[in-house]
Design a protein with these regions (language model features):
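Flexible gly/pro-rich beta->alpha loop and the following alpha-helix that scaffold active-site loops
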Residues: 18-82
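Cofactor-binding loop segments of dinucleotide-utilizing enzymes, especially the Rossmann-like FAD-
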Residues: 6-8, 33, 86
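Catalytic nucleophile loop
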Residues: 74-98
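Short, charged N-terminal beta->alpha structural module
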Residues: 2-24
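Amide-donor transfer/coupling interface in amidating biosynthetic enzymes
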Residues: 5, 100, 114-221
Length: 221
């Protein structure tokens, strides 16, 4: 299985999600977009993962419109996608939904109400977002909480608002990209956030593995 992972920041990693695909024998190629140039052709690609971004899907940057068009192309070509955070919102917008700003950012560890906890565990999951999805026609909600739709499927695609890939080192890079004051303004103690993330790593790895199993089951359904 050839998997193409799209990152948007050089500090990001594929984390537990990439690990779970590789454990299933996947060959993983990673493309940093837009820094490494145009999105690759999908010839020979069996699965796509689109990770998070600081940008909003509604920002006017040309690369965002390019990515939405590319995702529509993946859908038309029958290439399944796992969208994570920005990737989930991009998939939503590409397929006819809308993305809107939330009243408050959702940052930290949160549980979700899952329609099927074997498919999408209740968590907790790490969240780091301020936009949310208004789903396109044909999408099915798999999990939600009071803030947002947290997981949905549409066609052969799976999208999750949370970050199942994140381990301690990745979160530390994210926190280091913000000042301590910026993080605390969100009501987050960065040291505690990092400690909680490190403590959750074994369970996070297992939840990410379960999510990849669900993504592949949706692909095959």
């Amino acid at each position: 299985m050839r998997v193409l992972a799209i990152r948007h920041h050089d500090i990001d990693t594929v984390g537990f999600i990439g690990e779970a695909f590789e454990a299933r024998g996947a060959s993983l190629a990673v493309h940093l977009f837009p820094d490494e140039g145009p999105l690759p052709a999908l010839d020979g690609v069996d699965y796509v993962i689109v990770f998070g971004a600081v940008s909003s899907v509604n920002d006017p940057d040309p690369w965002i419109a390019e990515e939405l068009a590319w995702l529509r192309g993946a859908d038309h070509a029958g290439v399944p996608v796992l969208g994570i955070c920005f990737g989930a919102q991009a998939l939503c917008a590409a397929l006819g939904g809308r993305v809107e700003r939330m009243p408050d950012k959702e940052v930290g560890w949160f549980t979700v109400e899952s329609a099927d906890e074997d498919a999408v565990p209740a968590g907790p999951w790490l969240e780091f977002h301020e936009d949310h999805c208004l789903l396109p026609a044909g999408a099915t909600v798999l999990a939600r909480n009071d803030s947002a739709v947290q997981a949905f499927r549409i066609g052969r695609h799976l999208a999750v608002q949370f970050h199942p890939e994140v381990d301690g080192p990745l979160l530390k890079r994210w926190l280091d990209a913000h000042t301590d004051a910026e993080t605390r303004k969100l009501g987050i103690d960065p040291d505690q956030f990092l400690a909680d993330t490190i403590r959750e790593e074994p369970a996070s790895r297992a939840r990410a593995d379960r999510l990849v199993a669900t993504a592949l089951a949706i692909r095959d359904s």
